[in-house]
Amino acid sequence: MSDGFCGTHLQIMVRTRGLGCALGQVTGRGLGRGDRDDSDDAPQRRRPTASARRQQVTVTADHVDEPVIPAPDVQDDPMEAPAAVEDILADIPADAGTETVEDQHQGFLGCLSDPSVLTAYADHVACSVWTGEECPELKLSSHGRKVQSLGRPVPAIEGLIVGTGLSPLIACSVDTGDRGLLSAFVERWHRETSSFHLPMGELTITLDDASSLLHLPIIGDLHAFEPLHVDDAVQMLVDLLMVSPESARAETDQCRGPYVRLQWVRDIYQRRCQAGHWTAAARAYLLHLLGCTLFANKSATNVHVVYLEALRDLSMTERYAWGVAALVHMYDQLNDASMSHSRHLGGYITLLQCWIYKHFPSVAESTADQDYDEASPRACRWIATKKTVKSIRTPSYRERLDRLRISDVCWIPYGEHREVRDFHVRSCYFGLLRWGPVAVYYRPERVVRQFGYTQTIPAPPVDSWVSYDDIHDRWMHYKDYIVPAGEVCVVPGACSSDYIDWFFRISHPFMTPDHALDPMLHGHAPQSRVVP
């Protein structure tokens, strides 16, 4: 499989500011971001204006290679092309580096003392929880049962499906998402750092996690498809799924954009199988699979037609880094869901839930499959059905996370799986990752403990302007953008002596004030000593 990219030169500028509504939003369905008035109990910190968030930050020579991350705005679906396009901007968060000196020292009452890193904290769900506003559990877009109900592909197309590299997704989807567990982790996700903030520091879903849990490739091309007009979506359905123009138009009209219902795709798959149109049947099967897994959106019923583009030539589908696609879409959905006004979580729920099962065994009450085969994706190791997923509410999980210590985390969990899925150095690449018009920052420098190194204070995030071509070039030359190896951990989860104190200043290690007042829960609580 090639590490290179297709030669398409995209004249599209990517702005580092955040794509909340990204891939899965259905226009006109009320799923976009909305503004929310501050409550009377919220910390009295003025919310940054849109113009302030959009300011370009000068990148200094010291930070020219450092990535930066997203902060959202209400916008149209970037996957759907506007009527007239001159410059298409893909946004990612304007975060650290944009605060004034006064802002840096203002802080938030009782929790975040230095807001220079988590600049969107005032609009974050963690701020709402801290001030006593109980947020409802997120609605999940979990389609594991849809995948299982469709079943494995018919024998005539099984070879085509396996050849795309996507077949591991057929078997590893969980049936039931744990709303309480996932909501508790979303509360700790921050777009500025692309990581979860916990009492012992930061952790994130890495490229190695995507590779090990899903057995998807993390080496290959990043798909460079462009936003799609509805007319183009209709033509794509006609060409690739062999439907009539009238049927395609009726379906996109019903979905109010370049989308089709998952049920409609299942019906097309069955019809193409009956007619013996095997290539079209394989494309329909894969579109349904992608819509239920990697690209699950908050509509919970639709899939974007644009994903068919990667299935146009099935012999070339395997060249894409599908593990990157999973991570990009998951990060983007987490970025959106962690804002205080959000009520839904899209993305591949299996990836997030099984990542939690693997790294936090003391938090999640998971059920292991006794018949698990080590040759299968690691996500197949757990059984998550309505019977096995316990109805534990978010506050209980919040309490468990507030009590976590370094020793409670499984920092390097795939040792016994390396014979099946080897570690690739590309997992330590830092910078922007993209899939179509969606771009997110991948920041392994903040979580080097997950690679076996001692965590030190990372450089502050810096905002910058880059083009899609720049993302391609960096990814192609990934060896120039690998996080430097530091000191190897003697004890798993080790960090430098100044790291925890720094982290407690720039973050909110605890979600509730009661735990913040308990020094014995602090990861840097002093050891007892004999006083003479």
How does the language model describe each region?
Residues R343-W355, F430-L432:
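Amphipathic alpha-helical protein-interaction segments enriched in hydrophobic
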Residues V64, Q75-T100, L109, S113-W130, ...:
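Long acidic/polar interaction regions in large eukaryotic complex-forming proteins
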